[in-house]
A protein has these predicted regions:
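Enriched but not universal
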Residues: 1-18, 26, 498, 505-507
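Pro/Thr/Ser/Gly-rich low-complexity, intrinsically disordered linker/stalk tracts
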Residues: 9-54, 98, 114-129
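Solvent-exposed loop/turn segments flanking beta-strands in beta-repeat/beta-sandwich domains
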Residues: 42-75
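Beta-strand-rich modules
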Residues: 93-116
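C-terminal, surface-exposed recognition/capping segments
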Residues: 133-137, 325, 346-365, 388-389, ...
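Short aromatic-cysteine micro-motif
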Residues: 218-225, 252-389
């Protein structure tokens, strides 16, 4: 008996037919005193090309303290018969109490009024005050200057941008410390080896303390610590829907899909901020340091780099994928572009042949939080008080390429085998050394999967891979790689690989 015949027998013996399927998705996000609700309704049920159930609509209810069990259990928000009404544009429901737990249910019904009461159609929300920024990446658009769209509280903002000339500079658009907690919490410090803050640096001249007069230790190689910049706690939510990759950034955890991998310690605790090195790593007395006025450490194995970083103290290590991914997302958020060189500055990106081609640390002691050069000027840039693109690849923890698959881990402990990592199941394809054309997003971040773009389309950065070994990721690019630099991903090197254009940084 065919599926349709069996279904027809059931229908013939059921007065109201069968109930619709579960909703495809119900997304409920907290608001200050309310909730933002989006519903992807079920499709009609079709078996053997025969229509079995027509979805007429769904009933939205909300209930305090417990999930609605039926279509009459709770407060009716709306009975929706325009099925796509809240698929893309959210329903804003107000009048709720912050800190109180509510449950929102969407009960689909057929054209006979038969409801689906499955518990899978329910979502929990706790309203609270928050700041939420975001953007989506239109995957159908290859233009790096139009594919990013602002949403949420930054929907009407003007983006930041490097000053596109030979003298350099930066414009901050609508973004400011007054409206953005990320900028407010981004501050330069001298930090002791035990992880405690010693003192704050002048924001426009790191050679001075915050008073702008007293000399700092930013160039003092004997200082028992490093120059570091804080990034305040950011909760991130990533998801893909209708050829759009959504990136949301919040100052609080609005729902369980918001995570803070870049701020999570090995014991699972979440820090109120993380420290990023202000300078590329230099090797001083067997410690990987962030100190101005030094040459970059190069030609070391990854194992040595990790050891030198940990020699600073128990909490130190080289960089890691979750913080690099977050930095790349913030570059996109602030500049509304996926062309990192045009938007943030080119960096020391071309003409390099040996270690003396690399920029010395502390080249941009002045100029403020952001600085860069346009017009393909070959000078390093600065983002959130941290010098970037100084000429060498940055080796990081947390991203391996094992048997041709990306393996990722957001927090310590890390290893070189992929044990305990998440196998994303994703691979890079195309000609190694080409420009990134396609990237797939998971909850952990974005992973290049197809090469074949160009320097001014899609993501404008390069990708390298080797599926025949266990590769330890390098990111950013080097001054040997020209326009491929920026957000480049290189999973083409064993952890033992050394070169004049590979370095690392100490993170805390």
């Amino acid at each position: 008996m065919s599926d349709f015949v069996a279904a027809k027998y059931i229908l013939d013996n059921m007065k109201n037919g069968i109930a619709p399927d579960n909703v495809e998705a119900i997304n409920v996000m907290a608001m200050d005193g309310g909730a933002k609700i989006r519903v992807r309704p079920p499709k009609d049920t079709v078996i053997d090309n025969q229509l079995i159930c027509t979805v007429k609509g769904y009933r939205l209810l909300i209930k305090e303290g417990a999930a609605p069990e039926t279509e009459d259990d709770g407060t009716l928000i709306e009975e929706v018969t325009q099925l796509d009404k809240y698929k893309a544009n959210a329903l804003l429901h107000s009048g709720l109490v912050n800190g109180t737990t509510y449950y929102v249910a969407a009960f689909p019904f057929n054209d006979y009024g038969l409801f689906n009461r499955n518990a899978a159609n329910v979502a929990k929300v706790v309203p609270q005050a928050y700041t939420l920024f975001g953007y989506y990446d239109d995957l159908t658009d290859s233009n790096p200057e139009t594919k990013i769209h602002y949403i949420e509280m930054n929907a009407g903002f003007e983006p930041m941008r490097v000053v596109a000339d030979n003298t350099g500079g930066w414009t901050e658009g609508t973004w400011s410390e007054e409206n953005c907690w990320i900028l407010r919490g981004n501050r330069p410090y001298m930090v002791k080896n035990d992880g405690t803050i010693d003192y704050e640096l002048c924001h426009t001249d790191y050679s001075k303390k915050i008073d702008g007069v007293t000399a700092s230790d930013v160039s003092n190689a004997a200082y028992a610590g490093n120059a570091m910049a804080t990034i305040p706690l950011i909760w991130v939510k990533r998801y893909t829907e209708d050829n759009k990759q959504y990136h949301l950034f919040c100052d609080t955890q609005l729902d369980d899909d918001f995570t803070a991998g870049a701020f999570t310690r090995a014991d699972g605790s979440i820090e109120p901020y993380t420290f990023c090195p202000m300078f590329t790593g230099s090797l001083i007395l067997n410690k990987l340091r962030s100190i101005a006025g030094q040459g970059q450490m190069t030609s070391q194995t990854g194992t040595n780099e990790i050891t030198y970083a940990k020699n600073n103290g128990a909490l130190w290590n080289i960089g890691y994928f979750s913080i690099v991914q977050l930095r790349w997302e913030l570059e996109t958020l602030f500049t509304r572009s996926t062309n990192k060189q045009d938007a943030c500055g080119y960096g020391n990106y071309t003409g390099g042949t040996q270690a003396n081609s690399l920029s010395r640390t502390g080249t941009l002691l002045t100029g403020g939080r952001f600085y860069g050069y346009g017009s393909k000027v070959n000078k390093l840039r600065k983002f959130m008080h941290c010098e970037q693109q100084a000429g060498a690849w940055e080796r990081i923890n947390g991203l391996l390429y094992v048997g041709g698959k990306y393996y990722v881990k957001e927090s310590e402990p890390y290893n070189e085998t992929g044990d305990g990592y998440i196998n994303t199941g994703l691979s890079m394809s195309g000609t190694s050394g080409g420009y990134i054309k396609t990237q797939v997003m998971t909850k952990q971040g974005c992973f290049p999967t197809e090469l074949g773009g160009s320097s001014d389309t899609y993501y404008c950065c390069g990708g390298w891979y080797n599926a025949g070994q266990v590769d330890h990721a390098l990111v950013g690019g080097s001054c040997y790689d020209s326009l491929l630099c920026g957000g480049a991903v290189n999973v083409n090197n064993l952890v033992s690989n050394t070169n004049w254009n590979i370095s690392a940084r100490s993170f805390l």
